[in-house]
Amino acid sequence: MQELTRRLAGSGCELWAVSSTNDWVIRAAAARFHVPPTQVLAVCVDVNDGHCTDRLIRVPTDELKASAIRELMPRMPDAGFGNSMHDLAMLELARRAFAINPNHDLEEVARQRGWEVYHPD
C-alpha cells in the first residue's frame, strides 16, 4: 500500500485518509502513506484547557464519512478504499471503489457491484 500511495502522490493525486478511528492514530499512520495531516478526516476529541473531554467532534463513520467528504474535500474522490460496511457510503462516492481485505458483507456488495476486491497476503 505504501508503494501505491507513493506512486499516486508522485503522479499528482490528492490523498486523503478518512477513518472512524481517533485522529492522532490516523495522522501518524497517514504520514507513512504520504497523506498530509490537513487531509485526514478522523474522530477528534474535544480538548478544554489542555485536557481531553468526553466529547467527540466529528465521528466519520457510515453515512457521516460521505458527509464529511462532501463537506471538506474540494471534489469527489477518483478512488476509494475501504474494508467494512462502515465504508460503503464513502465508497459509493468514488469513481472507482476498492474493497481491501473486506469483511464478508462488504465483499458481497463489492462483488455485486463489480468493484475490485483485494486480499493482501
Regions found by a protein language model. Name each.
Residues 1-121:
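C-terminal cap/substrate-recognition subdomain and adjoining C-terminal extension
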